[in-house]
Amino acid sequence: SIFTDSNENNSESIFEFQLSQDATNSQMGRNYTPLNYKMSQNFGWFRVNADVFEIHRNMYPNDPRIDATYMYDYTHAITGAPQRTYPAITTRTNVRASHPFLFKFAEKDKTHSNQYNSQNIVVYRYADLLLMLAEISNELQNGQQLGYVTEVLNRVGMTPQVGFLGSQEEFRDAIMNEYRFELIGEGEDAHNNRRRGFDYFLNNTILTHNTNTNPGFKASVDILLSTDPTGTMTLPIPQSEINTNELINN
């Protein structure tokens, strides 16, 4: 995985924040590392919706990116007891056990006990560029789109799924899924989900989640996403900011 201390600034990386637990005080690892995965100072607040995981797994069952992206089965760093969440357990009886952790930015050293860690934050990498070029090529219909996607997938021993081999519209849907499979959690999820407009966001993200059958939407552990464009396509400005901004006249 490129998301390790030992594989920082590799040939795929275009821009990384250079971090050190002794200087920059990054709490990324603390926030992403599953509870009790390492010795101390970790919370694992950030998860991936179970249905997003299943879409990825169903599309590419043998994808090595899955283990590099998600964490759902590990041992307690102190007691050695098994710690499992979905899909290692499928009952989904409570929120904590219902969604896998996002493992990319987690601290990988189980003996680590510092509040901060040293793993760099990858801001932009070559795979992101290739997917963008594939998307552009598909819109231009210049015949280059499949080559870019193939380069991304071949590096992990995979080949493009069938959606990339169909029509322009089918390729468009496939590339938007590929952004998610490859880049989830790297800072562009909200933008990528929305940049094709509300209708596309509604049909390919919101309703896909709200009506999913694998593992199945469950009100007690899943968030029902709003279908109101006024609340989903804009980022509300806090009233306190509006009240104190002297450049706003009315």
PLM segments and residue spans:
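Acidic/polar-rich alpha-helix caps and helix-coil junctions
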Residues: 1-29, 64-250
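Short, cationic low-complexity segments
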Residues: 34-53
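Non-catalytic, low-structured ubiquitin/UBL-interacting segments
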Residues: 56
